[in-house]
Amino acid sequence: GMLTGVKLDGGLYPLSGFDGETIAHGLDSLDEKLQKYSKMGIDFAKWRVAFEINKEKGTPSDAAIEANLRILAQYAKACQKYGIVPIVEPEVVYSGNHTIKQCREITEKILKSLFKELEIFKVDLAGTILKTGMVLAGSENEIQSSSREVARETVEVLKRSVPKELAG
């Protein structure tokens, strides 16, 4: 059969005091949305946060990472309370001139931090899905990653960062 899902984040907005960084909105209405969607029989929900790598600006900042991942963890816990499978999406944005090494370091930092937050909020990882991107150089970098490099770096980051208990 087919499963139904819904996007629950309210979009990305500028993170006050952090030039060029964003934060996801929507926690304020999450509970009532989950009540409604639970009654409708929704199976899963997705929430996206995004991080831009910019070495000159120092992004993503620790503050932006922490704030966004805490929101993802709160969302995931709330979904599970209503029997809805949460899909967590901490996206590292492809645009920019970052190297594959910078992407690897940032992606690994974000994923490790995400799973710490999910643990703090007692999110059941067996009932959670991670939507992640590939580890690769930014679209504006002169040296683009080969498919072999992308595969190797992505798999290594996932092995080092993602607990075995995660569902998907």
Language-model-detected regions and their locations in the chain:
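Alpha/beta catalytic barrel-like cores
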Residues: 1-42, 53, 147, 153, ...
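Short, well-ordered coil/turn segments that N-cap beta-strands
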Residues: 1-4, 40-43, 80-86, 119-128, ...
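Acidic, His- and aromatic-enriched active-site or binding-groove loops in soluble protein domains
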Residues: 4, 65-76, 104-119, 149-156
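Glycine-rich, proline-tolerant flexible connector loops at the mouths of alpha/beta enzymes
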Residues: 17-18, 49-63, 92-98, 139
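Glycine-rich anion/phosphate-binding loops
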Residues: 19-35, 60-75, 109
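Conserved, mostly hydrophobic/aromatic
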Residues: 47, 88, 130
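Short glycine/threonine-rich loop-to-helix capping motif typified by GTGT followed
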Residues: 59-60, 97-107, 136-150
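Catalytic-face loop-and-helix region of soluble metabolic enzyme cores
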Residues: 122-123, 133-168
